Amino acid sequence: MSDGDTNGPTGPIDRRMLEALVCPMTQAPLSYDAEKQELISKAAHLAYPIRGGIPIMLEEEARKLD
């Protein structure tokens, strides 16, 4: 495992990839919630799931945040 990896329940997630991703709705930066395996867009109030180490960046797959 390299220094740029973050462990999730399905294996390492490349931190450089996470830093390069932005919210598809707002183009705002995302934060990583390792416990829930989600990428959080505070600007859009959405949480995008990470499944099998792959971020699912589709609005219809995202969970709305309160």
Swiss-Prot record:
Single GO cellular component term: cytosol
SUPFAM superfamilies: Trm112p-like
Coiled coil ranges: none
Pfam hit, one: Trm112p
Domain of life: Bacteria
Gene3D superfamilies: 2.20.25.10
Xref: InterPro entries: Trm112-like
Similarity field: Belongs to the UPF0434 family.
HAMAP family: UPF0434
PANTHER family: PROTEIN PREY, MITOCHONDRIAL, ZGC:162634
Name listed for the protein in its UniProt record: UPF0434 protein Jann_0424
Organism encoding this protein: Jannaschia sp. (strain CCS1)
